[in-house]
Protein backbone atom coordinates (compact mmCIF):
# COMPACT_ATOMS: atom_id res chain seq x y z
CA UNK A 1 0.00 0.00 0.00
CA UNK A 2 2.84 2.32 0.75
CA UNK A 3 4.29 1.62 -2.63
CA UNK A 4 0.97 2.44 -4.28
CA UNK A 5 0.72 5.70 -2.37
CA UNK A 6 4.20 6.67 -3.38
CA UNK A 7 3.45 5.89 -7.01
CA UNK A 8 0.26 7.95 -6.92
CA UNK A 9 2.12 10.91 -5.44
CA UNK A 10 4.69 10.58 -8.17
CA UNK A 11 1.94 10.66 -10.76
CA UNK A 12 0.47 13.79 -9.20
CA UNK A 13 3.81 15.57 -9.20
CA UNK A 14 4.48 14.58 -12.79
CA UNK A 15 1.08 15.86 -13.91
CA UNK A 16 1.67 19.19 -12.18
CA UNK A 17 5.04 19.51 -13.85
CA UNK A 18 3.50 18.78 -17.24
CA UNK A 19 0.84 21.42 -16.67
CA UNK A 20 3.48 24.02 -15.84
CA UNK A 21 5.54 23.18 -18.90
CA UNK A 22 2.47 23.33 -21.14
CA UNK A 23 1.42 26.85 -20.08
CA UNK A 24 0.33 29.17 -22.88
CA UNK A 25 3.37 31.43 -22.33
CA UNK A 26 5.87 28.65 -23.00
CA UNK A 27 4.09 27.48 -26.09
CA UNK A 28 4.54 30.81 -27.82
CA UNK A 29 6.75 30.84 -30.85
CA UNK A 30 7.89 33.88 -32.75
CA UNK A 31 10.66 35.74 -34.50
CA UNK A 32 13.36 37.75 -32.77
CA UNK A 33 15.41 40.77 -33.83
CA UNK A 34 18.26 42.59 -32.17
CA UNK A 35 17.38 46.28 -32.15
CA UNK A 36 18.16 49.59 -30.49
CA UNK A 37 15.40 50.64 -28.14
CA UNK A 38 14.27 54.09 -26.98
CA UNK A 39 11.32 55.29 -24.92
CA UNK A 40 9.55 58.65 -25.13
CA UNK A 41 8.86 60.35 -21.81
CA UNK A 42 6.52 63.31 -21.78
CA UNK A 43 7.16 66.29 -19.56
CA UNK A 44 4.66 66.19 -16.69
CA UNK A 45 2.51 69.19 -16.00
CA UNK A 46 3.70 71.31 -13.10
CA UNK A 47 2.44 74.04 -10.86
CA UNK A 48 4.11 77.32 -11.89
CA UNK A 49 4.20 78.43 -8.27
CA UNK A 50 5.86 75.26 -6.97
CA UNK A 51 9.64 75.15 -6.71
CA UNK A 52 11.52 72.31 -8.47
CA UNK A 53 13.17 69.58 -6.40
CA UNK A 54 16.71 70.08 -5.20
CA UNK A 55 19.27 69.60 -7.95
CA UNK A 56 16.71 70.00 -10.74
CA UNK A 57 15.42 72.90 -12.76
CA UNK A 58 12.39 73.46 -14.95
CA UNK A 59 12.82 73.40 -18.73
CA UNK A 60 11.35 76.38 -20.52
CA UNK A 61 8.47 75.73 -22.91
CA UNK A 62 10.32 77.15 -25.90
CA UNK A 63 13.35 74.91 -25.41
CA UNK A 64 11.56 71.56 -25.73
CA UNK A 65 9.25 71.71 -28.69
CA UNK A 66 7.38 68.44 -28.05
CA UNK A 67 7.16 68.63 -24.25
CA UNK A 68 9.16 65.45 -23.81
CA UNK A 69 12.35 63.63 -24.67
CA UNK A 70 13.55 60.34 -26.10
CA UNK A 71 15.81 58.25 -23.83
CA UNK A 72 17.63 55.44 -25.66
CA UNK A 73 18.98 52.29 -24.07
CA UNK A 74 22.73 52.00 -23.70
CA UNK A 75 22.84 48.38 -24.93
CA UNK A 76 21.01 46.42 -27.65
CA UNK A 77 17.58 45.01 -26.93
CA UNK A 78 15.76 41.90 -28.09
CA UNK A 79 12.49 42.37 -30.01
CA UNK A 80 10.17 39.39 -30.24
CA UNK A 81 6.71 38.84 -31.72
CA UNK A 82 5.20 35.79 -30.02
CA UNK A 83 2.51 33.64 -31.65
CA UNK A 84 0.49 31.61 -29.09
CA UNK A 85 -0.48 28.09 -29.95
CA UNK A 86 -4.15 28.68 -29.11
CA UNK A 87 -6.20 30.03 -32.02
CA UNK A 88 -8.08 32.50 -29.83
CA UNK A 89 -4.92 34.02 -28.34
CA UNK A 90 -3.51 37.33 -29.52
CA UNK A 91 0.11 37.85 -30.63
CA UNK A 92 2.28 39.74 -28.15
CA UNK A 93 5.19 42.08 -28.85
CA UNK A 94 7.99 41.95 -26.28
CA UNK A 95 11.12 44.09 -25.89
CA UNK A 96 13.67 42.95 -23.32
CA UNK A 97 17.26 43.65 -22.38
CA UNK A 98 18.74 40.59 -20.81
CA UNK A 99 16.18 39.20 -18.38
CA UNK A 100 14.35 42.50 -17.91
CA UNK A 101 11.20 43.06 -20.00
CA UNK A 102 10.60 46.74 -20.82
CA UNK A 103 7.69 46.44 -23.26
CA UNK A 104 5.01 43.76 -23.51
CA UNK A 105 1.86 44.63 -25.45
CA UNK A 106 -0.77 43.01 -27.58
CA UNK A 107 0.02 43.62 -31.21
CA UNK A 108 -3.61 44.46 -31.93
CA UNK A 109 -3.55 47.64 -29.78
CA UNK A 110 -0.31 49.03 -31.20
CA UNK A 111 0.05 51.63 -33.93
CA UNK A 112 3.15 51.30 -36.11
CA UNK A 113 4.72 54.15 -38.07
CA UNK A 114 7.43 53.50 -40.65
CA UNK A 115 9.13 56.63 -42.07
CA UNK A 116 10.21 56.67 -45.69
CA UNK A 117 13.54 58.33 -46.44
CA UNK A 118 15.90 58.92 -49.34
CA UNK A 119 19.59 59.79 -49.59
CA UNK A 120 19.50 62.10 -52.61
CA UNK A 121 16.88 63.16 -55.07
CA UNK A 122 18.15 60.65 -57.65
CA UNK A 123 17.70 57.66 -55.32
CA UNK A 124 14.28 56.08 -54.87
CA UNK A 125 12.45 56.46 -51.58
CA UNK A 126 12.89 53.49 -49.26
CA UNK A 127 11.85 52.46 -45.79
CA UNK A 128 13.79 53.61 -42.76
CA UNK A 129 15.54 51.42 -40.21
CA UNK A 130 13.45 53.04 -37.46
CA UNK A 131 9.90 52.01 -36.57
CA UNK A 132 7.79 54.08 -34.16
CA UNK A 133 5.21 52.33 -32.01
CA UNK A 134 2.46 54.05 -30.01
CA UNK A 135 -0.48 52.96 -27.89
CA UNK A 136 -2.99 54.36 -25.42
CA UNK A 137 -2.60 53.28 -21.81
CA UNK A 138 -5.30 52.84 -19.16
CA UNK A 139 -4.98 56.52 -18.17
CA UNK A 140 -5.83 57.58 -21.75
CA UNK A 141 -2.28 58.79 -22.27
CA UNK A 142 -0.38 58.20 -25.50
CA UNK A 143 2.79 56.19 -24.90
CA UNK A 144 5.50 55.90 -27.54
CA UNK A 145 8.65 53.90 -28.08
CA UNK A 146 10.89 53.27 -31.07
CA UNK A 147 13.17 50.52 -32.34
CA UNK A 148 16.05 50.78 -34.80
CA UNK A 149 17.01 47.74 -36.86
CA UNK A 150 20.49 47.00 -38.22
CA UNK A 151 19.28 47.03 -41.84
CA UNK A 152 16.15 48.34 -43.61
CA UNK A 153 15.35 44.80 -44.71
CA UNK A 154 15.08 43.77 -41.04
CA UNK A 155 12.52 46.50 -40.44
CA UNK A 156 10.58 45.34 -43.48
CA UNK A 157 10.56 41.73 -42.27
CA UNK A 158 9.38 42.84 -38.82
CA UNK A 159 6.49 44.84 -40.27
CA UNK A 160 5.55 41.91 -42.51
CA UNK A 161 5.46 39.67 -39.45
CA UNK A 162 3.31 42.19 -37.58
CA UNK A 163 0.94 42.51 -40.52
CA UNK A 164 0.53 38.76 -40.73
CA UNK A 165 0.00 38.50 -36.96
CA UNK A 166 -2.59 41.20 -36.44
CA UNK A 167 -4.34 40.85 -39.79
CA UNK A 168 -6.84 43.63 -40.37
CA UNK A 169 -7.12 44.62 -36.69
CA UNK A 170 -3.79 46.42 -36.46
CA UNK A 171 -2.98 49.91 -37.61
CA UNK A 172 -0.06 50.40 -39.99
CA UNK A 173 1.04 53.91 -40.93
CA UNK A 174 3.72 54.42 -43.56
CA UNK A 175 4.98 57.98 -43.16
CA UNK A 176 5.80 59.53 -46.56
CA UNK A 177 9.05 61.28 -47.25
CA UNK A 178 9.07 64.81 -45.82
CA UNK A 179 11.21 67.54 -44.38
CA UNK A 180 11.29 65.98 -40.91
CA UNK A 181 13.34 63.00 -42.04
CA UNK A 182 16.82 62.87 -43.50
CA UNK A 183 18.99 60.16 -44.93
CA UNK A 184 20.44 57.66 -42.47
CA UNK A 185 23.57 55.56 -42.63
CA UNK A 186 25.33 53.05 -40.44
CA UNK A 187 26.06 55.65 -37.79
CA UNK A 188 23.55 55.64 -34.93
CA UNK A 189 23.98 59.33 -34.20
CA UNK A 190 23.22 60.82 -37.62
CA UNK A 191 19.54 59.95 -37.90
CA UNK A 192 17.56 63.07 -37.05
CA UNK A 193 13.80 63.39 -36.82
CA UNK A 194 11.70 66.15 -35.28
CA UNK A 195 9.74 63.79 -33.03
CA UNK A 196 11.94 60.77 -33.47
CA UNK A 197 14.82 58.93 -31.91
CA UNK A 198 17.71 61.07 -30.65
CA UNK A 199 20.93 59.39 -29.64
CA UNK A 200 23.18 60.68 -26.93
CA UNK A 201 26.63 61.82 -27.94
CA UNK A 202 29.65 61.62 -25.67
CA UNK A 203 31.27 64.74 -24.25
CA UNK A 204 34.29 64.45 -26.49
CA UNK A 205 32.26 64.67 -29.69
CA UNK A 206 30.33 67.65 -28.30
CA UNK A 207 33.54 69.48 -27.50
CA UNK A 208 34.93 68.66 -30.92
CA UNK A 209 31.85 70.05 -32.67
CA UNK A 210 32.00 73.25 -30.61
CA UNK A 211 35.63 73.72 -31.55
CA UNK A 212 34.85 73.34 -35.25
CA UNK A 213 31.84 75.64 -35.11
CA UNK A 214 33.77 78.53 -33.57
CA UNK A 215 36.53 79.57 -35.93
CA UNK A 216 38.69 82.66 -36.01
CA UNK A 217 38.33 84.68 -39.19
CA UNK A 218 41.71 86.00 -40.27
CA UNK A 219 42.66 87.48 -43.64
CA UNK A 220 44.73 85.11 -45.78
CA UNK A 221 48.43 85.87 -45.77
CA UNK A 222 50.63 85.39 -48.77
CA UNK A 223 53.64 83.11 -48.45
CA UNK A 224 56.03 85.96 -49.26
CA UNK A 225 54.07 88.55 -47.34
CA UNK A 226 55.86 90.20 -44.45
CA UNK A 227 54.48 91.89 -41.41
CA UNK A 228 53.60 95.57 -41.62
CA UNK A 229 56.82 97.29 -40.66
CA UNK A 230 57.78 100.75 -41.81
CA UNK A 231 61.23 100.93 -43.27
CA UNK A 232 61.59 104.58 -42.32
CA UNK A 233 60.14 105.18 -38.88
CA UNK A 234 59.87 108.71 -37.48
CA UNK A 235 62.46 109.80 -34.96
CA UNK A 236 61.40 109.43 -31.36
CA UNK A 237 61.27 112.33 -28.98
CA UNK A 238 64.16 110.87 -26.99
CA UNK A 239 66.50 111.01 -29.98
CA UNK A 240 65.54 114.63 -30.66
CA UNK A 241 66.14 115.63 -27.06
CA UNK A 242 69.57 114.02 -27.14
CA UNK A 243 70.53 116.42 -29.96
CA UNK A 244 69.59 119.53 -28.01
CA UNK A 245 73.22 120.70 -27.98
CA UNK A 246 73.21 121.19 -31.73
CA UNK A 247 72.17 124.43 -33.44
CA UNK A 248 68.40 125.19 -33.54
CA UNK A 249 68.23 124.90 -37.33
CA UNK A 250 69.63 121.39 -37.16
CA UNK A 251 67.12 120.31 -34.50
CA UNK A 252 64.28 121.86 -36.50
CA UNK A 253 65.31 119.81 -39.51
CA UNK A 254 65.29 116.65 -37.40
CA UNK A 255 61.73 117.32 -36.23
CA UNK A 256 60.40 118.18 -39.69
CA UNK A 257 61.91 115.23 -41.52
CA UNK A 258 59.73 112.69 -39.65
CA UNK A 259 56.54 114.65 -40.41
CA UNK A 260 57.07 115.78 -43.98
CA UNK A 261 58.95 112.80 -45.33
CA UNK A 262 55.86 110.68 -46.11
CA UNK A 263 53.97 113.65 -47.57
CA UNK A 264 56.61 114.78 -50.06
CA UNK A 265 56.68 113.39 -53.55
CA UNK A 266 59.95 112.71 -55.33
CA UNK A 267 60.97 115.51 -57.64
CA UNK A 268 61.07 114.64 -61.35
CA UNK A 269 64.58 114.22 -62.62
CA UNK A 270 66.13 116.07 -65.51
CA UNK A 271 66.99 114.57 -68.82
CA UNK A 272 70.41 113.42 -67.62
CA UNK A 273 70.94 111.51 -64.36
CA UNK A 274 74.72 111.10 -64.43
CA UNK A 275 75.47 113.66 -61.72
CA UNK A 276 72.72 112.27 -59.46
CA UNK A 277 74.12 108.80 -59.83
CA UNK A 278 77.51 110.16 -58.82
CA UNK A 279 76.00 111.73 -55.69
CA UNK A 280 74.47 108.35 -54.68
CA UNK A 281 77.87 106.72 -54.97
CA UNK A 282 79.44 109.19 -52.53
CA UNK A 283 77.02 108.45 -49.67
CA UNK A 284 78.99 105.63 -48.07
CA UNK A 285 81.10 107.84 -45.83
CA UNK A 286 78.20 110.22 -44.96
CA UNK A 287 80.32 113.09 -46.30
CA UNK A 288 77.73 115.83 -45.93
CA UNK A 289 80.27 118.62 -46.45
CA UNK A 290 81.30 117.20 -49.81
CA UNK A 291 77.66 117.08 -50.92
CA UNK A 292 77.15 120.69 -49.81
CA UNK A 293 80.11 121.79 -51.92
CA UNK A 294 78.72 119.86 -54.88
CA UNK A 295 75.28 121.46 -54.47
CA UNK A 296 76.77 124.96 -54.00
CA UNK A 297 78.34 125.10 -57.41
CA UNK A 298 75.03 126.17 -58.98
CA UNK A 299 74.49 125.25 -62.60
CA UNK A 300 76.92 122.65 -63.91
CA UNK A 301 77.47 123.63 -67.52
CA UNK A 302 78.96 120.30 -68.52
CA UNK A 303 76.01 118.18 -67.41
CA UNK A 304 73.20 120.74 -67.57
CA UNK A 305 71.62 119.85 -64.19
CA UNK A 306 69.77 122.52 -62.19
CA UNK A 307 71.30 123.32 -58.79
CA UNK A 308 67.86 123.34 -57.13
CA UNK A 309 67.39 119.67 -58.03
CA UNK A 310 70.69 118.81 -56.40
CA UNK A 311 69.77 120.82 -53.31
CA UNK A 312 66.42 119.06 -53.02
CA UNK A 313 68.07 115.67 -53.45
CA UNK A 314 70.65 116.57 -50.81
CA UNK A 315 67.92 117.49 -48.31
CA UNK A 316 66.10 114.24 -49.08
CA UNK A 317 69.28 112.29 -48.43
CA UNK A 318 69.85 114.12 -45.15
CA UNK A 319 66.30 113.31 -44.04
CA UNK A 320 66.91 109.69 -44.96
CA UNK A 321 70.01 109.67 -42.80
CA UNK A 322 68.11 111.31 -39.95
CA UNK A 323 65.63 108.41 -39.99
CA UNK A 324 68.44 105.84 -39.99
CA UNK A 325 69.24 104.38 -36.57
CA UNK A 326 72.92 103.94 -37.39
CA UNK A 327 73.21 107.65 -38.23
CA UNK A 328 71.46 108.56 -34.98
CA UNK A 329 73.90 106.36 -33.09
CA UNK A 330 76.76 108.16 -34.79
CA UNK A 331 75.33 111.53 -33.71
CA UNK A 332 75.03 110.33 -30.13
CA UNK A 333 78.65 109.16 -30.15
CA UNK A 334 79.69 112.51 -31.59
CA UNK A 335 77.73 114.32 -28.90
CA UNK A 336 79.46 112.31 -26.18
CA UNK A 337 82.87 113.00 -27.70
CA UNK A 338 82.17 116.76 -27.74
CA UNK A 339 81.05 116.62 -24.11
CA UNK A 340 84.27 114.85 -23.16
CA UNK A 341 86.31 117.56 -24.92
CA UNK A 342 84.61 120.30 -22.93
CA UNK A 343 81.43 120.92 -24.89
CA UNK A 344 82.94 123.45 -27.28
CA UNK A 345 80.87 123.39 -30.51
CA UNK A 346 83.58 125.31 -32.35
CA UNK A 347 85.70 122.18 -32.41
From Swiss-Prot:
One of its GO terms (biological process) is homologous chromosome pairing at meiosis. Disruption phenotype: Male and female sterility. During meiosis, synapsis is uncoupled from recombination and pairing in the mutant gametes. Pfam families: PH_PHS1. GO terms for cellular component: cytoplasm. Keywords: Cytoplasm, Meiosis. It is found in: Cytoplasm. It comes from the Eukaryota. The keyword Cytoplasm applies. Required for accurate chromosome segregation in meiosis. Required for pairing to occur between homologous chromosomes. Acts in early recombination steps and ensures pairing fidelity and proper repair of meiotic DNA double-strand-breaks. Regulates recombination and pairing of homologous chromosomes during meiotic prophase by controlling transport of RAD50 from cytoplasm to the nucleus. May affect pairing of the gene-rich fraction of the genome rather than preventing pairing between repetitive DNA elements. This is Protein POOR HOMOLOGOUS SYNAPSIS 1. It comes from Zea mays.
Amino acid sequence: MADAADSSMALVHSSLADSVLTSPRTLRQGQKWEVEYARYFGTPRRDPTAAPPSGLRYIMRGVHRHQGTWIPASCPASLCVCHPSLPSAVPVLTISIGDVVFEEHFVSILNFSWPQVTCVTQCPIRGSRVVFVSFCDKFKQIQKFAVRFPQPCDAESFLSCVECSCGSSGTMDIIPFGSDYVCEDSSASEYIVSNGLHHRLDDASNLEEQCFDHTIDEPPMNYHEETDQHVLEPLSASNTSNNSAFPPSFNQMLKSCSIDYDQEEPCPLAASNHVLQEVYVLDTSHDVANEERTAGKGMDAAEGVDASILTYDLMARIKTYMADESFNDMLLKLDKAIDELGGDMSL
